[in-house]
Amino acid sequence: MDWLAKYWWILVLVFLVGVLINVIKDLKRVDHKKFLANKPELPPHRDFNDKWDDDDDWPKKDQPKK
């Protein structure tokens, strides 16, 4: 068990390499073209700043300068 105390990080690296290999294999199975063709429509975004959208303090382009 002394070797486990010294070389525990090697087991962690082997585990992480295994996870990365499985992620890569799973991502290769994803058909992104099929997903993009059947992509669901997103609902419109609603923010809570809409009450300030009307009273915008940016100058209008059509207004003459004072």
Curated annotation (Swiss-Prot):
<dbReference type="Pfam" id="PF13980">
    <property type="entry name" value="UPF0370"/>
</dbReference>
<comment type="similarity">
    <text>Belongs to the UPF0370 family.</text>
</comment>
<feature type="region of interest" description="Disordered">
    <location>
        <begin position="39"/>
        <end position="66"/>
    </location>
</feature>
<keyword id="KW-1133">Transmembrane helix</keyword>
<keyword id="KW-1003">Cell membrane</keyword>
<keyword id="KW-0472">Membrane</keyword>
<feature type="compositionally biased region" description="Basic and acidic residues">
    <location>
        <begin position="42"/>
        <end position="51"/>
    </location>
</feature>
<keyword id="KW-0812">Transmembrane</keyword>
<protein>
    <recommendedName>
        <fullName>UPF0370 protein CKO_00315</fullName>
    </recommendedName>
</protein>
<feature type="transmembrane region" description="Helical">
    <location>
        <begin position="4"/>
        <end position="24"/>
    </location>
</feature>
<dbReference type="InterPro" id="IPR020910">
    <property type="entry name" value="UPF0370"/>
</dbReference>
<dbReference type="GO" id="GO:0005886">
    <property type="term" value="C:plasma membrane"/>
</dbReference>
